[in-house]
Structures are given as structure tokens and as C-alpha cells.
């Protein structure tokens, strides 16, 4: 069966059909298990001009499509959803000195539709695609420089060679690899995001979120669990209902409203608040601020100061290399161990008595709470020269 066109006529060339179009092309199904291939040429009357865009060409695919593979070189890719057949709009730009417009191919085999312009990998041209597919279609998109937008599809795998990526309403797992452009994701079933330098923003992820960013900032919110690796940019995480892990090479880290949280900072400051579970922080030099931690507190400041307030932690272990430590508890902890490495230490705890041991290295020591050597709750503080104060909350 020949393909059908409403506005245009087929011309045979080298055993394949080239469609000279002025409007819309409708491709009919060839057979239940067959495949089709379409090659288009310019529809500009009088021929193209150097570096000019061929008027947008639209194709309607009547055959069922379950998966889409789009490849673009230097031009945008946009995939959205709507009921009905697949619609493809192509925007072609090229240099007429190179011999004519690039070949654009569409091939389909067993429900997989592939859109590509292979000639543009080495030629001075670009082809952009704007595709409308039914919801649930899985998408693979690869762009060498142009922006990529995918909205409302099934699972998606996006590879961007530098342009920004935007994905929203993805009904299956989402994978994004971006070599420099920013990445923005709103609502996906799960996401694995890798950015070569651009910023990353992800919100409303219903499954696990994994982010690797070489240098751009990372902002995530409303996800059940997140693992973030930042090569230097700041990290902001909020409304994480489950575990949160952050490794930051130098940028600051802010976490608010999370489950069990582990933060490793290569130098930037750390702020953690409303942590519903244990909090573990290793900071190479930046200061640490924490509040509203309900689980065990474990902090190694590496030199920067630590201030932790509104704690209901059952235990706390703090190690510092010179920075001061301030801990404020709302409920009586079972065990507290602090070593400031030289900085001052200030603790406020409710109730008592506590079994208190302290070594200030000769500096001032003030203990204003009830103490007993055999008490069930214990506080041990070593300041190595810093002053110590323990008082009631």
C-alpha cells in the first residue's frame, strides 16, 4: 500500500518515496507486522535559501505507536501528549551550499517510531521535532545541543548534549543525562538525573530520586527518598518524606523536612531542620546548624561551629576540630558525647540527674544541672581548652 497524502504528490527516487509537501502528510498502516520509511524533501517554492528554515512540515501517523525514539542535532525536541494519532512537526535549517536539505527519516517497526536526521551529524544543518503522542508512550530522546521537552509520556530516557531539559508528568521511570544544560523535572514516577554542570531542579517525584551534578546547584522537593551528589554547587532539599543522602564537594547544603538524613560536605555550610529521624553530618570546614531533629544526632564539624536547637534526639555524638558547639534539647537525652577540639561547649538539657564527666583542659567549667554518678542519662564533654557550660533547658 502506498502512503497517502492530502496535500502533496509522491515522486519515486532510488527505490524510495520522496514527498514534496505543502501541508500535512498522513501515513497509513502497511500491515500488522510491517514497517514503513518516509523520506522528505524541501517544500519551499523556488528552492531554499542559505541557512534558512524550511517551512514546518507536519506528518500524521495513523499506525499505533507505543514507543518513540527521537534524535536531533542542534535543534529542539519537544514531545507532548494528546488523544488521537501521532503528529510530527519538523523544522529544518541547512546551508544550500551543501547540496540541499537534510534527509529526515521516520521508521516504524512493531510500534517503535524513530525520528532522525542522520546527515546532520556531520553537515551544517539541523532538524527539530515537535511530536504529539498518546499518553503512555515511552520516549527516548537524544539532542546534540538543542533543548529537550518531554511532557505527559510514559517512561523517558533523555540525553542532551548541552541544551536544557524539561520533563513533566512522566508516568514511568525517567533518566536524564545532560552535558551542561540545566535539568528541570516536575512530577515523575522516579528519576535518575545526571548533569554535567547545569543546575538541577526536581519536584513531585513519586519514586526514588538520584541526582549527580558536576557543579550546578541542586534543588529537590516533595520526593519520598533522594540521593544527591553535588560537585560544588549548593544543594537545597525540602519535603523529603523518607531517607535523604547528600554528598557535596564544596557548596552549601540545606535540608528541611526530611526523614533519616546523611550529609557529607566538602567545605560549605550545612543547615538541617525538621529531620524526622537520625541526622548524620560530616562537614570539612563549614559551620553546621540543626534544629528539630528527632533521631540520633551524629556530627563531625571538621573545624566549623555547630549549633543545634529544639532537639528530641535520644543521643548525640559531636566531634569538632576547634569550632564551638551549642546543643539545646527539648527532651532529656540518654547519652551525649562532645569533643570540641579546643572550642567552647554549651549544652542545655531538661530534667536530670545526669552522670556528667568533663575535661576542659583547665578552662572555665559551669555545670548547673542535677548530677549523679549512677544516673541513667550521661553527658561527657571534652573541650581541650575551651570553656564549658551545662545548664537546664
Regions found by a protein language model. Give the residues of each.
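Terminal targeting segments of Actinobacterial cell-envelope proteins
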Residues: 1-17
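Short linear S-[DN]-x-LW-Φ motif typified by the pepsin-like aspartic protease active-site region
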Residues: 35-114, 122-140, 147-159, 164-169, ...
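Hydrophobic membrane-insertion alpha-helices, especially the h-region
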Residues: 16-36
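Short, surface-exposed interaction patches in beta-rich subdomains
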Residues: 183-195, 200-393
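Amphipathic repeat-derived elements
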Residues: 2-7, 53-57, 67, 72-77, ...
Amino acid at each position: 500500500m502506498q502512503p497517502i497524502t492530502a496535500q502533496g504528490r509522491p515522486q519515486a527516487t532510488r527505490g524510495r518515496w520522496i514527498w514534496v509537501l505543502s501541508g500535512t502528510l498522513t501515513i497509513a498502516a502497511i500491515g500488522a507486522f510491517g514497517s514503513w520509511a518516509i523520506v522528505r524533501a524541501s517544500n519551499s517554492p523556488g528552492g531554499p535559501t542559505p541557512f534558512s528554515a524550511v517551512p514546518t512540515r507536519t506528518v500524521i501517523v495513523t499506525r499505533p505507536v507505543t514507543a518513540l525514539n527521537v534524535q536531533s542535532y542542534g535543534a529542539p525536541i519537544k514531545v507532548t501528549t494528546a488523544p488521537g494519532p501521532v503528529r510530527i512537526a519538523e523544522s529544518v535549517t541547512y546551508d544550500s551550499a551543501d547540496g540541499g536539505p537534510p534527509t529526515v527519516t521516520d521508521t516504524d517497526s512493531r510500534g517503535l517510531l524513530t525520528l532522525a536526521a542522520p546527515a546532520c551529524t556531520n553537515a551544517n544543518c539541523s532538524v527539530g521535532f515537535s511530536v504529539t503522542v498518546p499518553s503512555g508512550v515511552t520516549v527516548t530522546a537524544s539532542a546534540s545541543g538543542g533543548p529537550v521537552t518531554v511532557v505527559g509520556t510514559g517512561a523517558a530516557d533523555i540525553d542532551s548534549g548541552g541544551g536544557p531539559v524539561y520533563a513533566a508528568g512522566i508516568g514511568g521511570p525517567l533518566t536524564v543525562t545532560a552535558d551542561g544544560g540545566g535539568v528541570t523535572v516536575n512530577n515523575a514516577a522516579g528519576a535518575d538525573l545526571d548533569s554535567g554542570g547545569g543546575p538541577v531542579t526536581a519536584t513531585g517525584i513519586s519514586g526514588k530520586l538520584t541526582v549527580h551534578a558536576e557543579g550546578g546547584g541542586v534543588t529537590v522537593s516533595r520526593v519520598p527518598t533522594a540521593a544527591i551528589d553535588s560537585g560544588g554547587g549548593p544543594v537545597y532539599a525540602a519535603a523529603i518524606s523518607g531517607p535523604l543522602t547528600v554528598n557535596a564537594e564544596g557548596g552549601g547544603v540545606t535540608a528541611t523536612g526530611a526523614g533519616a538524613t546523611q550529609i557529607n560536605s566538602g567545605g560549605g555550610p550545612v543547615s538541617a531542620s525538621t529531620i524526622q529521624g537520625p541526622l548524620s553530618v560530616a562537614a570539612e570546614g563549614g559551620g553546621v546548624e540543626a534544629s528539630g531533629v528527632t533521631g540520633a544526632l551524629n556530627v563531625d564539624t571538621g573545624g566549623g561551629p555547630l549549633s543545634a536547637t529544639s532537639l528530641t534526639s535520644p543521643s548525640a555524638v559531636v566531634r569538632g576540630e576547634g569550632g564551638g558547639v551549642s546543643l539545646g534539647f527539648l527532651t532529656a537525652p540518654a547519652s551525649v558525647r562532645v569533643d570540641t577540639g579546643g572550642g567552647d561547649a554549651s549544652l542545655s538539657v531538661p530534667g536530670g540527674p545526669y552522670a556528667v564527666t568533663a575535661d576542659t583542659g583547665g578552662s572555665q567549667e559551669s555545670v548547673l544541672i542535677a548530677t549523679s554518678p549512677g544516673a541513667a542519662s550521661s553527658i561527657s564533654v571534652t573541650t581541650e581548652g575551651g570553656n564549658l557550660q551545662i545548664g537546664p533547658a
